[in-house]
Amino acid sequence: AIGIACFAGGTADAANINLNEKTFPDPYVYHYVQEMCEYDTAHSTYYLPEAEKAGVTYFVVTGKTFFRYGLDGGQAVDFSGMQNFSNITSVTLDLRYNIGGRVQGDWNFRADNFFQCFPKVKELVIRSYGGQKVKLTGTSKTLESVDVLLDDEDGSLECTVSAPKVKRVCINGKFAAKSKPLGKCFPNAKRLDITTANIQKVNVTGCKKLEQLQLTDTTQKAIGQINLSKNKKLKSVKITGKLRKTKIVISKKMNKKLVQKLKKTTKKAGAKLIKR
């Protein structure tokens, strides 16, 4: 669904969106937008009135959306042209194709221009199925909240995006080898909720404003070390996994109440708390 159900009622400064293959080069996005357009019989063209365009504030693509236009799975959909909907602040992508509650296939999206196509997005939700790699790359100056859920253990997230305004991140899935530390991607994040099979790839040292951290390791492998020494503003920490003999490094300036809680939980789990 696209957010035209909630029209703003006003007029935008920009002109109407004229539907053509130059503006929307991807055939699946073209057909999707066409369903919202009006037909200009005088010029034999489709267009979306600017008042309706201004009312589009969210964009939701489910698994069935593009498959009804002939997508057979595996392709990377290009969202070029969606930047014309300049008021979109929320984007949800379900990269699965469901029939009768069963996943029948998956699709992906072109990542290198994604944040150019949605230049004002604040909330991003992505759900994927299968062994494909989902990429978050480029730069977003508006993004504030990120949710990525990978249903298949063979899938991975390659996160190299620069999004300095993000405050909340929830990721469930494996990180790809080329992923950057979360502190590079989301340096001002205050809340991180990470569930992954490769917890050693989770580097939060650059998240200096981090207040809430939840780490869950989905394997039964030993966790060597978790470094929280640079996260001096932490107020809440929960770590789940095989913590026996794990070294958890914390700042000497960490909240005293939190330190006491960590001492109890680490002792019970057989982990070691180290202050730096």
Task: Show where each model-derived region lies.
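Bacterial N-terminal signal peptides
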Residues: 1-6
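N-terminal capping/linker segments that flank leucine-rich repeat
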Residues: 7-175, 179-187, 193, 247-276
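Extracellular beta-helix/beta-solenoid repeat scaffolds
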Residues: 90-92, 98-99, 120, 212, ...
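Tandem repeat domain/solenoid detector
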Residues: 122, 142-144, 165-167, 185-191, ...
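Predominantly soluble domains enriched in secretory-pathway, periplasmic, or organellar proteins
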Residues: 139, 179, 183-184, 203-205, ...
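Extracellular beta-rich repeat passengers
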Residues: 208-209, 218-219, 228-233, 250-253, ...
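Leucine-rich repeat domain C-terminal region
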Residues: 226, 235-258
